[in-house]
């Protein structure tokens, strides 16, 4: 198993082999994310829509007025001229996605031969090991659509470099903070803080859950937990550990702990943390389905008769027959299987094949989360984002909640903190 502490140290130090590999990967990805290759494509427009949903006005948040210095960020990755920040962000996040999948495979590979890198990055290698809903088509597997020799070389260099860190004995415990710290190292603080990204320390999640379980007057092993804004999964991991401590021989833990998040990288990180806990014991013969979903808990699907109206968050709203939703919940298909179902063949037909698979994955996650069983304890550290940084579309879609829950009852001096709308 990889020594994540040593990985973290090398990523921070500029004169180390791993830091050099990171810089070369990010620059290579940046080169291939040339807007002339992508702008105008349906997939690019969908990505831009979701980016706005997650971060609001990205150009405003990454502007000099927001104290984000493109020059100093470019220096870190060896750029001669200041890079375009949204493009740099996508390059950095793509690198993190590749890194985290390599770490995930290392936690469970055992005696299994190393799969081709294309199978690992696409998620097929994990499906072949019986692990479902880990990863698939997302905004960060775009290199597979090109798979130029330069891209392949950089990704293989990263995999080879990580082998030097495979020093921890089998069964070692993965700290729930480790992956968050790696993300915080890969994505420079200036970018993270401009985007409002902060993570909850493990000790705080543990203390919070202990208090919640104590107040419930039940054992953790008898409860179901949900984190509707799970981030990197720190609350999920603490809940899994509490359940296992209470019921060492109990039912599969994945039936009891679930998480939602809007950010695809947060979801991926949470799944790696979740998988690391589950992989410490033999996986069920039927395989393992990871109940962590790309889902916006404030923008839930709407039931209209026999149809579930789902906002994908990418500018597309889909009317999905309720009967198809029930099949998806029962069968848990992958995106390709889902689109082959008779009732799904008319969905997303305006998109290119890779776009259809990506959006089908988003639809499935919305469906699975919407029909997920009720929880006894809702846990987590809710995201905090300034109102003016939310996209206009998100403000309009969620504004009714503030009145319904009495959140606009502000009087006196506190009116100075209110916004124009």
What is each PLM-predicted segment?
Residues 170, 178, 184, 188-421:
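SAM-dependent methyltransferase catalytic region
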Residues 1, 138-146, 315, 323:
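N-terminal secretory/membrane-targeting helices
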Residues 1-41:
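Intrinsically disordered, low-complexity terminal regions enriched in charged/polar residues
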Residues 23-34, 46, 90-93, 300-319:
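Solvent-exposed, charged interface segments at domain starts and junctions
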Residues 10, 39, 43, 87-91, ...:
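Non-transmembrane, amphipathic alpha-helical segments
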Residues 26, 30, 40-48, 52-67, ...:
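Class I S-adenosyl-L-methionine
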Residues 73-89, 354-365:
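Short linear interaction motifs
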Residues 3, 18-21, 25, 43, ...:
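Alpha-helical structural motif
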